[in-house]
UniProtKB/Swiss-Prot annotation:
GO terms for molecular function: lyase activity. PANTHER family: D-GLUTAMATE CYCLASE, MITOCHONDRIAL (PTHR32022:SF10). Residues 200-298, 312-421 are annotated as: Disordered. This is Putative hydro-lyase KRH_21160.
Amino acid sequence: MDETTLTPDRARQRFRAGLVRPAAGMAPGHAQANLVIVPRELAFDVLLFAPRNPKPCPVLGVLDAGETTGALLPGGDIRTDVPQYVVYENGVEVARPHDITPYWREDLVTVMLGCSFTFEDALQAHGIRLAHIDQGVNVPMYRTSRRCESAGRLSGPLVVSMRPVPAARVADAVRITSRYPAVHGAPVHVGDPGALGSRTWGHRTSATPCGSPPARFPCSGRAGSRRRPRWWSRLRRSPSPTPRATCSSPTPGTPTTRCPDGARERGGRALVHPCGVRSLPTRQPQPRPAVSRGSPVTPVARRRRLWLAALTRAGRGSRPVRHPGSPAATVPPGPGRRTPAPRAPRRCAPRSGRGTPCRRASRGTPGASSRGPGPCPRAAPVRRRPPPAPGGSAGSRPTWRPRRRSPALPAPRTRCPAVSR
């Protein structure tokens, strides 16, 4: 039976029966947890240490003193359902049993911390292969020079787990794991291991070897690899400064300092990790495309175009051209072209029956029209009384009357407030 497709219940049964192997890749889609079992007098320090260092020690649940099961593991037993335990006495390792029932006491408190094995199935679902799963070994872990924030009697350096990731998929790994903040989340570092206090990956805390495949380079990260963002398709065309990448993740064995989650874009071009290491190639800004004819034109540009078009048309003849804000100017005709005869200014006659000339009449002598003698065609028509009906007397009233207009009401009179006082 494929062990990578086991459900949590079946996996706990296999461990209880004596199966010893890392839980990496098992129970996909379910959260995995590390157990920290301490006496009651140290439980407060542990529960204070975890919130001060939330990235390496994310708390998933706590069991009261003497409890061996809970809501997070229905039907399970924390004394037998783990592949292997490490027993410490006075800070010294004394045993690695598969069953801690002989060591169990009623004053022991169990704290469950999130494990980075939880998001490994998501990484594999997006095509990011993990070396320790392919080789069937545990994830490698390293001790760094960074210190965790102490709490009571608990203190120590940051311990990270390392996962080799191809350089072209580092951004994908960062994005995927950042969606799991309860199980370490985004990497704590990506790139040169010297930033964590070691020139090479030599300060190991586990004896299980895990080699890096070709075309990968060591890159330290807090909790593994992530998924590709949308802008990575632009960055991947640039040459990579290094051939491969590895991500390191903190393990709950020792605490870590706080570090912001994930990588981010700084300046809109280069992907820079919060620790300050430039881990991805930069991309030079591209020139802005020219404005096409379909783009909106500003009012200033539109007036400039109209003015140039008027000058071009005026070059074919002598027509008055007026620029906004300048007096009228006459452009001389082009070579070999006749000068047209000057046009007479347009005149308008006053509107008969109104007593007020139209707007054109104020520009010249009333009575003249640009279309010839006679009144202006735009003048208001004159209403004349029709002749009397045939057979009627001269003194009889006509059958037609012009429409009478109601007299305008006078404007209301208002008194000045100062006078009314």
